[in-house]
Design a protein with these regions (language model features):
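Short, conserved structural patches
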Residues: 2-3, 64, 68-197
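Alpha-helical assembly-interface signal, strongest on the long, hydrophobic N-terminal helix that forms
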Residues: 2-91
């Protein structure tokens, strides 16, 4: 290789190097490549959090719906129980309810000594509260010779995307304590009446 040719190559490289800081043609592509991972992470994380918030809202709505429907009755029959569970499923739509959605409600009576016990309980995809089991009620609800309807909801939520941001499956829960609206104590009719001692 001749010395003249090497000199021309060095000159061409030097020109390219001096022109490079003034050339703006690839700046947008480089900036986009740097920002893209952050934007994708932000999008997936935001989507996962939004889905979890929406699912939690549905869990709260189901607990309030179930508690309110039970509290508006005086005797819960098997047909009414099934209708309440159907209402819970309808409120929970469009999320899949079986077997991830667990619903439970119970009539809790407080005796003269202030001890709260479960008189009857029903559950969907869950175990019902044990009859005559003692439970702790929140302050203000443990009034002697009264009853309370206790509605509980639990949902195992796994976001369709973004599980890395939520840590996988989250258990969303809510519960509602509500006094009967029409009678002092709501009974459960399973062929024989339960509750209201």
């Amino acid at each position: 290789m001749s010395l003249l040719r090497i000199s021309k190559m060095i000159g061409a490289v030097r020109k390219s190097i001096t022109r490079l800081p003034r050339d703006k043609r690839g700046v947008s592509a480089v900036e986009f490549a740097l920002i893209l991972p952050f934007m994708v992470t932000l999008y997936l994380g935001g989507t996962a959090i939004t889905q979890a918030i929406m699912a939690k809202r549905k869990v709260v709505l189901v607990a309030h719906t179930v508690g309110d429907l039970v509290a508006r009755d005086n005797v819960i029959t098997t047909a009414e129980r099934d209708a309440i569970f159907d209402a819970a499923k309808a409120v929970f739509a469009p999320y899949p309810w079986s077997p991830l959605l667990k619903v439970r409600f119970a009539s809790v009576e407080v005796n003269a000594a202030g001890t709260a016990t479960v008189k009857w309980s029903e559950a969907l995809n869950w175990t019902a509260q044990a009859i005559n089991s003692t439970v702790a009620l929140p302050a203000g609800l443990n009034t002697a010779n009264t009853s309370v309807i206790w509605a509980e909801v639990s949902y195992d939520f796994t976001p369709p995307i973004g599980t890395a941001f939520t840590g996988g499956t989250m258990t969303l829960t809510d519960q509602l304590y509500i006094r009967p609206r029409l009678v002092s104590c709501i009974k459960r009719d399973t062929g024989t009446l339960k509750g209201c001692t």
